[in-house]
Design a protein with these regions (language model features):
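Hydrophobic positions in the central parallel beta-sheet of the AAA+
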Residues: 47, 119-121, 143
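Conserved motor-coupling elements within RecA-like helicase/translocase cores
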Residues: 109-119
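Short basic/glycine-enriched coil/helix segment immediately N-terminal to the Walker B
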Residues: 39-42, 113-115, 130-141
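SF2 helicase catalytic motif II
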Residues: 124, 133-176
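ATP-dependent helicase/translocase motor core
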Residues: 1-53, 57-75, 92-96, 115, ...
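Conserved helix-turn-beta segment of the N-terminal RecA-like "Helicase ATP-binding" lobe
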Residues: 84-110
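Conserved helicase/translocase P-loop NTPase motor core
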Residues: 117-130
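Conserved RecA-like ASCE P-loop NTPase motor core of nucleic-acid helicases/translocases
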Residues: 74-83
Length: 177
């Protein structure tokens, strides 16, 4: 419980006992992701949805499904964003969906991670710590890049070119940027 609170000014402990169910539009996106992967073999996907529609919840539900489909695997997760606040906010949907108040570690700003298996990291920290030197190309099974419209920037190229996850999921409200 202490670890869950170290990233927060508010108490979120009650949400870790609830079943998080997707809204119908979120379920439609989840179904489309599953079809793209199963039918077409596309494992690098982009979710485009308006701000506030729960793209992070969609990614957490999709990650949970991925883990259920791969029992016995470590299901290592790398969640990348360009701002600390986004990373802090993104932890809660994953913890709620997975019902695990201790899931995930922040590696951004003054936060130091004890483990890199389920990591929420800023792209700046990723690059400044030469993270690819610490992990193999297939270390992460599932990678989420939030605000994916930033991925065209040079700062994201090392990440996207190096890693070979089973799933790469981009999230954005504005793909045209």
């Amino acid at each position: 419980a202490l670890k869950a609170e170290k990233y927060s000014e508010t108490d979120h402990s009650g949400i870790y006992t609830l079943d998080i169910q997707p809204y119908s539009y979120q379920q439609e996106i989840l179904d489309k992701l599953e079809a793209e992967r199963a039918v077409r073999g596309h494992t690098r996907n982009l979710v485009v949805a308006a701000t506030g529609t729960g793209k992070t919840v969609i990614s957490a539900l999709d990650y949970k499904r991925f883990c259920k489909q791969h029992p016995g695997k470590p299901c290592r997760l790398l969640f990348v964003a360009h701002r600390e606040e986004i990373l802090k906010q993104s932890l809660y949907p994953f913890r709620a969906v997975l019902k695990d108040a201790n899931f995930g570690e922040l590696l951004v700003g003054n936060y130091k991670a004890d483990s890199i298996d389920h990591l929420f990291i800023s792209i700046q920290t990723f690059n400044s710590q030469d993270f690819t030197a610490k992990t193999g190309a297939d270390f992460y099974d599932y990678i989420v890049v939030d605000e994916f419209h930033h991925a065209a920037a040079p700062t994201y190229q090392k990440l996207l070119e190096y890693y070979q996850p089973q799933i790469l999921l981009g999230l954005t409200a504005t793909p045209e940027r």
